[in-house]
Amino acid sequence: LMTNGDPSDGWDNVNYIDKVFGTGLTQKHNVTVQGGSEKTRYFASFGYLGQKGNIDNFNYSRYNVRANIDSEIARNFKFSLGLSGVLSNRHTPAFNSGGTDANSYVGEAGWLSIANQTIQMHPYLPEKYDGLYTASIKKNTTLPQSPLAAIYESGYKKTRGVSLSVNAAISYELPWVKGLVLKLSGSFDWGSSYNKNLNTPYNLMSYSSGEWKKTADPRGNGDGNNLGEGSSYWQQLVGQASVSYVNSFGKNNLDLLALLEVRDARSNNLSAYVKE
Protein backbone atom coordinates (compact mmCIF):
# COMPACT_ATOMS: atom_id res chain seq x y z
CA LEU A 1 0.00 0.00 0.00
CA MET A 2 2.85 2.39 0.72
CA THR A 3 4.41 1.84 -2.71
CA ASN A 4 1.38 1.57 -4.99
CA GLY A 5 1.57 5.28 -5.89
CA ASP A 6 -1.96 6.00 -4.63
CA PRO A 7 -1.90 8.11 -1.43
CA SER A 8 -5.69 8.32 -1.32
CA ASP A 9 -5.77 5.04 0.60
CA GLY A 10 -4.00 6.76 3.52
CA TRP A 11 -0.62 5.17 2.93
CA ASP A 12 2.44 6.53 1.15
CA ASN A 13 6.23 6.57 1.15
CA VAL A 14 7.37 10.17 1.70
CA ASN A 15 10.82 11.45 2.62
CA TYR A 16 9.69 14.43 4.67
CA ILE A 17 13.25 15.61 5.28
CA ASP A 18 13.67 16.06 1.52
CA LYS A 19 10.22 17.65 1.28
CA VAL A 20 11.01 20.25 3.93
CA PHE A 21 14.72 20.93 3.51
CA GLY A 22 15.93 22.07 0.11
CA THR A 23 18.89 24.13 -1.02
CA GLY A 24 19.30 27.60 0.43
CA LEU A 25 20.70 30.49 -1.57
CA THR A 26 22.78 33.44 -0.41
CA GLN A 27 23.90 36.20 -2.73
CA LYS A 28 25.99 39.22 -1.85
CA HIS A 29 26.91 42.15 -4.09
CA ASN A 30 29.02 45.22 -3.35
CA VAL A 31 30.01 48.23 -5.45
CA THR A 32 32.68 50.61 -4.17
CA VAL A 33 33.77 53.97 -5.56
CA GLN A 34 36.65 55.97 -4.15
CA GLY A 35 39.00 58.69 -5.27
CA GLY A 36 39.81 62.34 -4.80
CA SER A 37 42.56 64.88 -5.09
CA GLU A 38 45.33 66.24 -2.91
CA LYS A 39 42.88 68.09 -0.67
CA THR A 40 39.68 66.06 -1.06
CA ARG A 41 39.01 62.34 -0.70
CA TYR A 42 35.70 60.52 -1.14
CA PHE A 43 34.41 56.99 -0.68
CA ALA A 44 31.05 55.36 -1.45
CA SER A 45 29.88 51.78 -1.05
CA PHE A 46 26.61 50.11 -2.03
CA GLY A 47 25.74 46.58 -0.96
CA TYR A 48 23.01 43.97 -1.23
CA LEU A 49 22.53 40.73 0.68
CA GLY A 50 19.79 38.28 -0.26
CA GLN A 51 19.05 34.98 1.45
CA LYS A 52 16.55 32.29 0.57
CA GLY A 53 16.34 29.69 3.29
CA ASN A 54 16.61 25.96 2.75
CA ILE A 55 13.01 25.84 4.02
CA ASP A 56 10.33 27.50 1.89
CA ASN A 57 9.03 30.94 2.92
CA PHE A 58 12.17 31.87 4.88
CA ASN A 59 13.60 34.94 3.13
CA TYR A 60 15.81 37.87 4.07
CA SER A 61 17.12 40.87 2.13
CA ARG A 62 19.29 43.82 3.11
CA TYR A 63 20.44 46.93 1.27
CA ASN A 64 23.15 49.15 2.68
CA VAL A 65 24.91 52.33 1.61
CA ARG A 66 27.90 54.13 3.08
CA ALA A 67 29.60 57.31 1.92
CA ASN A 68 32.06 59.81 3.32
CA ILE A 69 34.09 62.77 2.19
CA ASP A 70 37.10 64.50 3.76
CA SER A 71 38.24 67.84 2.47
CA GLU A 72 40.52 70.74 3.28
CA ILE A 73 38.05 73.45 2.27
CA ALA A 74 40.41 76.34 3.02
CA ARG A 75 43.76 76.93 4.59
CA ASN A 76 43.74 75.33 8.08
CA PHE A 77 40.04 74.42 7.68
CA LYS A 78 39.09 70.73 7.40
CA PHE A 79 35.63 69.29 6.84
CA SER A 80 34.30 65.71 6.93
CA LEU A 81 30.87 64.25 6.24
CA GLY A 82 29.70 60.65 6.60
CA LEU A 83 26.47 58.88 5.76
CA SER A 84 25.31 55.30 6.21
CA GLY A 85 21.96 53.58 5.86
CA VAL A 86 20.48 50.09 6.00
CA LEU A 87 17.14 48.73 4.78
CA SER A 88 16.22 45.15 5.69
CA ASN A 89 13.23 42.85 5.18
CA ARG A 90 12.59 39.45 6.76
CA HIS A 91 9.75 37.01 6.02
CA THR A 92 9.13 33.65 7.72
CA PRO A 93 6.22 31.33 8.47
CA ALA A 94 4.53 31.65 11.86
CA PHE A 95 6.61 28.73 13.18
CA ASN A 96 10.34 29.01 13.79
CA SER A 97 12.71 26.95 11.68
CA GLY A 98 14.49 25.55 14.74
CA GLY A 99 15.83 26.59 18.12
CA THR A 100 15.50 25.57 21.75
CA ASP A 101 13.00 26.18 24.52
CA ALA A 102 15.57 27.91 26.76
CA ASN A 103 14.02 31.36 26.34
CA SER A 104 10.46 31.30 27.65
CA TYR A 105 9.80 34.73 26.12
CA VAL A 106 9.70 33.32 22.58
CA GLY A 107 7.58 30.33 23.56
CA GLU A 108 8.37 26.72 22.77
CA ALA A 109 10.49 27.54 19.75
CA GLY A 110 12.26 24.19 19.60
CA TRP A 111 9.34 22.00 20.66
CA LEU A 112 7.09 23.19 17.82
CA SER A 113 9.76 24.25 15.33
CA ILE A 114 9.53 23.09 11.73
CA ALA A 115 12.72 21.06 12.14
CA ASN A 116 11.32 19.26 15.18
CA GLN A 117 8.00 18.58 13.47
CA THR A 118 9.85 17.16 10.47
CA ILE A 119 11.71 14.51 12.43
CA GLN A 120 8.46 13.55 14.20
CA MET A 121 6.62 12.99 10.91
CA HIS A 122 6.01 9.37 9.86
CA PRO A 123 7.16 8.59 6.29
CA TYR A 124 4.24 6.23 5.63
CA LEU A 125 1.76 9.12 5.92
CA PRO A 126 0.78 10.86 2.66
CA GLU A 127 1.27 14.60 2.38
CA LYS A 128 -2.50 15.09 2.37
CA TYR A 129 -5.48 12.95 3.25
CA ASP A 130 -9.08 13.94 2.70
CA GLY A 131 -7.92 17.36 1.47
CA LEU A 132 -5.91 18.24 4.60
CA TYR A 133 -2.24 17.97 5.47
CA THR A 134 -1.52 14.88 7.51
CA ALA A 135 0.09 14.84 10.94
CA SER A 136 1.61 12.43 13.40
CA ILE A 137 0.99 12.76 17.13
CA LYS A 138 4.09 13.56 19.15
CA LYS A 139 4.82 10.82 21.66
CA ASN A 140 3.43 11.40 25.17
CA THR A 141 1.49 14.45 23.95
CA THR A 142 -1.65 15.28 22.00
CA LEU A 143 0.14 17.73 19.70
CA PRO A 144 -0.09 16.99 15.96
CA GLN A 145 3.17 17.38 14.04
CA SER A 146 2.87 18.51 10.41
CA PRO A 147 5.87 20.40 9.00
CA LEU A 148 4.29 21.13 5.60
CA ALA A 149 1.23 22.72 7.19
CA ALA A 150 3.52 24.70 9.50
CA ILE A 151 5.33 26.09 6.45
CA TYR A 152 2.41 26.83 4.14
CA GLU A 153 -0.69 27.34 6.31
CA SER A 154 0.41 28.73 9.69
CA GLY A 155 0.60 32.42 8.70
CA TYR A 156 3.67 34.61 8.59
CA LYS A 157 6.05 36.92 10.41
CA LYS A 158 7.23 40.03 8.58
CA THR A 159 9.83 42.49 9.82
CA ARG A 160 11.12 45.62 8.10
CA GLY A 161 13.94 47.73 9.49
CA VAL A 162 15.43 51.06 8.43
CA SER A 163 18.39 52.86 9.97
CA LEU A 164 20.23 56.06 9.02
CA SER A 165 23.34 57.66 10.44
CA VAL A 166 24.84 61.06 9.52
CA ASN A 167 27.91 62.68 11.03
CA ALA A 168 29.81 65.86 10.19
CA ALA A 169 32.78 67.73 11.60
CA ILE A 170 34.67 70.94 10.87
CA SER A 171 37.97 71.93 12.44
CA TYR A 172 40.27 74.94 12.35
CA GLU A 173 43.93 74.90 13.28
CA LEU A 174 44.99 78.29 14.55
CA PRO A 175 48.08 79.32 12.57
CA TRP A 176 49.47 81.63 15.26
CA VAL A 177 49.37 78.95 18.00
CA LYS A 178 50.99 75.73 16.90
CA GLY A 179 48.96 72.63 17.87
CA LEU A 180 45.79 74.50 18.87
CA VAL A 181 42.67 73.17 17.09
CA LEU A 182 39.04 74.25 17.37
CA LYS A 183 36.48 71.64 16.33
CA LEU A 184 32.71 71.34 15.95
CA SER A 185 31.10 67.97 15.26
CA GLY A 186 27.67 66.43 15.29
CA SER A 187 25.88 63.19 14.52
CA PHE A 188 22.31 62.12 13.95
CA ASP A 189 21.18 58.50 14.21
CA TRP A 190 17.67 57.34 13.38
CA GLY A 191 16.09 53.93 13.11
CA SER A 192 12.67 52.34 12.81
CA SER A 193 11.24 48.85 12.64
CA TYR A 194 7.87 47.45 11.71
CA ASN A 195 6.64 43.94 12.33
CA LYS A 196 3.46 42.12 11.41
CA ASN A 197 2.62 38.64 12.68
CA LEU A 198 -0.36 36.71 11.39
CA ASN A 199 -1.33 33.37 12.92
CA THR A 200 -3.84 31.44 10.82
CA PRO A 201 -5.28 28.31 12.44
CA TYR A 202 -5.56 25.21 10.31
CA ASN A 203 -6.92 21.69 10.56
CA LEU A 204 -5.00 18.47 10.08
CA MET A 205 -5.69 14.81 9.56
CA SER A 206 -3.74 12.98 12.22
CA TYR A 207 -3.13 9.26 12.32
CA SER A 208 -2.95 7.61 15.71
CA SER A 209 -3.87 4.22 17.14
CA GLY A 210 -4.86 2.93 13.72
CA GLU A 211 -7.38 5.62 12.81
CA TRP A 212 -7.59 9.02 11.12
CA LYS A 213 -8.86 11.96 13.13
CA LYS A 214 -9.36 15.63 12.29
CA THR A 215 -7.37 17.82 14.69
CA ALA A 216 -6.51 21.50 15.12
CA ASP A 217 -2.98 22.82 14.73
CA PRO A 218 -0.67 22.43 17.76
CA ARG A 219 -0.83 26.10 18.79
CA GLY A 220 -4.45 25.75 19.87
CA ASN A 221 -5.50 29.01 18.22
CA GLY A 222 -9.11 27.96 17.80
CA ASP A 223 -11.11 29.09 14.80
CA GLY A 224 -9.99 32.72 14.41
CA ASN A 225 -6.99 34.45 12.91
CA ASN A 226 -4.65 36.34 15.23
CA LEU A 227 -2.95 39.48 13.93
CA GLY A 228 -0.35 41.51 15.75
CA GLU A 229 1.37 44.63 14.43
CA GLY A 230 3.99 46.81 16.00
CA SER A 231 6.31 49.65 15.13
CA SER A 232 9.09 51.43 16.92
CA TYR A 233 11.51 54.23 16.23
CA TRP A 234 14.47 55.81 17.93
CA GLN A 235 16.69 58.77 17.25
CA GLN A 236 19.74 60.36 18.81
CA LEU A 237 21.33 63.74 18.19
CA VAL A 238 24.82 64.47 19.50
CA GLY A 239 26.73 67.75 19.22
CA GLN A 240 30.29 68.42 20.36
CA ALA A 241 32.51 71.48 20.61
CA SER A 242 36.15 71.02 21.55
CA VAL A 243 39.45 72.79 21.91
CA SER A 244 42.59 70.66 21.76
CA TYR A 245 46.24 71.48 22.12
CA VAL A 246 49.08 69.13 21.24
CA ASN A 247 52.73 70.14 21.31
CA SER A 248 56.18 68.99 22.31
CA PHE A 249 58.76 70.86 24.36
CA GLY A 250 62.10 69.14 24.13
CA LYS A 251 61.55 65.64 25.49
CA ASN A 252 58.18 66.54 26.99
CA ASN A 253 54.80 66.12 25.29
CA LEU A 254 51.68 68.07 26.16
CA ASP A 255 48.18 67.02 25.14
CA LEU A 256 45.17 69.00 26.37
CA LEU A 257 41.48 68.66 25.51
CA ALA A 258 38.40 70.61 26.56
CA LEU A 259 35.13 69.14 25.33
CA LEU A 260 31.47 70.09 25.59
CA GLU A 261 28.81 67.59 24.51
CA VAL A 262 25.06 67.91 24.11
CA ARG A 263 22.98 64.78 23.60
CA ASP A 264 19.28 64.21 22.92
CA ALA A 265 17.74 60.74 22.56
CA ARG A 266 14.14 59.76 21.93
CA SER A 267 12.22 56.56 21.21
CA ASN A 268 8.67 55.36 20.81
CA ASN A 269 6.93 51.99 20.57
CA LEU A 270 3.43 51.14 19.41
CA SER A 271 1.72 47.76 19.10
CA ALA A 272 -1.75 46.40 18.47
CA TYR A 273 -3.35 42.96 18.53
CA VAL A 274 -6.63 41.72 17.12
CA LYS A 275 -8.32 38.33 17.06
CA GLU A 276 -10.96 37.44 14.52
Label each PLM-derived region with a short phrase.
Residues T26, S37-E38, E72-A74, E173-V177, ...:
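Outer-membrane beta-barrel channels and translocator barrels
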Residues A44, K138-T142, A168:
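Generic structural signal marking isolated hydrophobic packing positions
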Residues V166-K183:
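Short, charged helix-to-loop "capping" segments that act as catalytic/coupling loops
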Residues K39-R41, S163, G179-L180:
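Secondary-structure boundary/capping motif
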Residues T32-Q34, S45, N68, N167-S171, ...:
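Outer-membrane beta-barrel architecture
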Residues L1-D56, A94-S97:
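Residues embedded in well-ordered regular secondary structure
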Residues K28, S163-S165:
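Intrinsic-disorder/low-complexity, polar/charged segments enriched in Ser/Thr/Lys/Arg/Asp/Glu/Gln
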Residues L1-D12, G53-Y60, N64, N68-S163, ...:
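Surface-exposed loop/interface segments of Gram-negative outer-membrane beta-barrel transport/assembly proteins
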